[in-house]
Every structure is written in structure tokens, then in C-alpha cells.
């Protein structure tokens, strides 16, 4: 977060920081992120802590260590009070953090079972890149998560444009990226630094969620939105991509802030992180930074790997210079 603000300031030619919107909110605090069993938490235990206020063991979602029954989340409490509820993420909708708000599983990798729990809640809006393990690995002919949507009253929209068409008549909504985008990478929507025209964004998701949930404000709504790829960029130690993701997340918060500006007395926005990833450090023993050089990076680590793999495929995995490859392509 601080690195992003310093990076923004450097791009503007200023010393210090260029503040993000959410760092200027009136209240801030800190949290201790250890799980019930590990000094270093994972997203499942951390998500459960955020959703329920209870610490559990790593890998567990919505259940406590060695205990039954499962524990419910703030999203369930809101639904039980008559509020409309939405759960949204930039990664798969049955991933650890979103799952912690609606599912109960001893292992975060039980993606199919977590996805089935999604439909048991009756929440009004879900969004993410897609499902992981949409069919049961042990019985692929039953319990298809896409087919379960219609059976449980959910309308599936594929992409923001499709949402605009489908949402007016939908009672409950499941927004996923286009099938074409999922063929390229289903586990998440593209990084901000890799984004192409037509890609679904976290802003699209958040705008859709607020639009859908605010159809009826008589009892209010609860919405959880996760910028899930910030974590992944940090896992890759990819500073430039991380900064782009945080700026993109800040732009997403601006959409929520617009709603707050229209409903200031009824709206609470909480921005938090579940844990740190990657050991991000500013400085390596010197007294200066030069973050602005990162503006020259135009693709994420994932995107770069994809480009290299495509080049290898074109050259039958033979080592050739990029200049030679381009010349060959031009001649052919």
C-alpha cells in the first residue's frame, strides 16, 4: 500500500506519497493475522476470521478446529435480518476468501463442495472469474455447478454486457467472465497490467453488484468484494503488477464511495487485508528508491510466462532471438 503511494508520487515527480482514496478514510487500525494453529495464516483461516470473527486452523473455511457444527458469517447474519447479500471476487467464486462468507469445509481445496454450498445460502448476488472444479472429480456426471445455478433460481451472466441484458429480470444473479476469457484463464480475471479491451474488471463486478443489490434498499444490503489478485502478484514477487492491482482496487473502492456519497447516513465501507504475502520490502539497505522504473514493465509475471511459452511453441522450443523470430514472421 505504501509502496503504491510512493510509486504514484514518483510518477508525478513528487517526494513523499500520492495517497490512495481508501488510505484517507477517517479511521484505521491494525490486526494480528495468525490463525488458530499457525503463526502464518492462509487465506482460508484468514477469510474465516474476517467473515465470522473467529480464528480457525489453516485451510479451514467456516469451521472451527476440531469442532462441529460450522460457524456462520456476517453475510449469513445480514441475510437472516432480511438484507440483500452479495459476494464478489476477481478470482474464482469458490475460492478461499469468498467461500469463507458462505461455505463450510475442512479443506479449502474442496472447491466443488464449496461451490455447492454457494447455492444453499440464497444470497442475491455472486460474482467471480468462474468456478473451479465445476464438476465433481469423483462423479463428473452429477452436481454440475453451472446446472445447479438454474435449479436454485440463479441467472448466469457471462461478462458485464451480458449482465446488463440479464439483470433486469433476474431474481438472483451469478456473474462470471465470458466463456472465451475463461478458456484463456479461468482462475481469475486478467491482471490490470495485462487487461485488454472487453475484459471484465473488478469495477464492472462492483458496479453490477451495487446496482443489483440496491434494487431494494428497504432493509439495506451487505456486499463483500475481494481484489484477489493483489495476493497473487505478491506471491510472484511482482512489484509492478502489485502496484497496478492496488491502484485498480482503489478505483473499485471509488465506486463504493460514490454510493456512500449518495447514502452517507446508511453506508459503512470497511477496507481490509487478510494477510501479507511475499515479504514485500521497500529498500535493500540503501537510502533511496527508484520505483518509477517499474513504469516500463508492461506485463505481469504470468503474462510474460505466457508470451515466452507462445514463442517456444512457435519455434519448436528452439532458442532463437526475439529479433530473429519477428523477422521470420514478417517474411513468412
Give the location of each predicted region:
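Beta-strand elements within well-structured catalytic alpha/beta cores of enzymes
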Residues: 1-2, 78, 176, 220-228, ...
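Histidine-centered active-site microenvironments of extracellular/periplasmic hydrolases
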Residues: 275-318
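Active-site His/acidic residue clusters
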Residues: 96-102, 180-194, 217-220, 224-252
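Single conserved hydrophobic/aromatic residue that forms the stacking wall/gate
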Residues: 324-327, 331
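Surface-exposed loop and adjacent secondary-structure segments within mature catalytic domains
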Residues: 6-65, 75-76, 80-200, 280, ...
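Alpha/propeptide regions of enzymes that mature by internal proteolysis
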Residues: 57-63, 243, 247, 257-259
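Active-site regions of oxyanion-processing enzymes, predominantly non-cytosolic
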Residues: 159, 163-177, 205-227
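Metal-dependent active-site segment of extracytoplasmic phospho-/sulfohydrolases and closely related
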Residues: 3, 250-290
Amino acid at each position: 500500500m505504501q509502496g503504491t503511494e510512493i510509486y504514484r508520487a514518483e510518477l508525478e515527480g513528487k517526494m513523499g506519497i500520492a495517497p490512495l482514496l481508501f488510505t484517507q478514510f477517517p479511521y484505521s487500525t491494525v490486526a494480528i493475522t495468525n490463525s488458530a494453529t499457525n503463526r502464518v495464516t492462509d487465506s482460508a483461516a484468514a477469510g474465516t476470521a474476517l467473515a465470522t470473527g473467529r480464528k480457525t486452523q489453516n485451510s479451514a473455511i467456516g469451521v472451527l478446529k476440531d469442532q462441529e457444527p460450522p460457524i456462520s458469517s456476517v453475510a449469513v447474519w445480514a441475510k437472516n435480518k432480511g438484507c440483500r447479500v452479495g459476494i464478489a471476487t476477481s478470482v474464482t467464486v469458490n475460492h478461499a476468501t469468498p467461500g469463507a462468507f458462505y461455505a463450510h469445509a475442512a479443506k479449502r481445496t474442496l472447491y466443488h463442495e464449496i461451490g455447492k454450498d454457494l447455492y444453499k445460502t440464497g444470497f442475491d448476488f455472486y460474482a467471480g472469474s468462474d468456478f473451479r472444479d465445476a464438476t465433481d472429480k469423483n462423479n463428473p456426471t452429477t452436481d454440475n455447478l453451472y446446472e445447479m445455478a438454474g435449479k436454485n433460481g440463479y441467472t448466469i451472466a457471462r461478462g458485464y454486457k451480458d449482465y446488463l441484458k440479464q439483470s433486469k429480470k433476474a431474481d438472483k444473479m451469478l456473474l462470471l467472465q465470458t466463456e472465451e476469457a475463461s478458456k484463456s484463464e479461468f482462475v481469475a480475471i486478467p491482471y490490470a497490467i495485462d487487461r485488454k479491451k472487453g475484459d471484465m474488471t473488478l469495477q464492472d463486478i462492483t458496479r453490477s453488484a451495487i446496482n443489483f443489490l440496491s434494487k431494494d434498499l428497504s432493509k439495506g444490503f451487505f456486499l463483500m468484494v475481494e481484489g484477489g489478485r493483489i495476493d497473487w502478484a505478491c506471491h510472484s514477487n511482482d512489484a509492478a503488477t502489485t502496484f497496478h492491482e492496488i491502484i485498480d482496487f482503489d478505483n473499485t473502492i471509488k465506486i463504493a464511495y460514490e454510493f456512500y456519497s449518495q447514502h452517507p447516513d446508511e453506508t459503512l465501507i470497511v477496507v481490509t487485508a487478510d494477510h501479507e504475502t511475499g515479504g514485500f520490502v521497500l529498500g535493500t539497505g540503501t537510502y533511496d528508491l527508484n520505483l518509477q522504473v517499474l513504469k516500463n514493465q508492461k506485463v505481469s509475471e504470468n503474462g510474460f510466462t505466457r508470451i515466452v511459452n507462445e514463442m517456444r511453441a512457435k519455434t519448436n522450443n528452439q532458442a532463437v532471438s526475439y529479433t530473429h523470430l519477428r523477422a521470420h514472421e514478417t517474411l513468412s
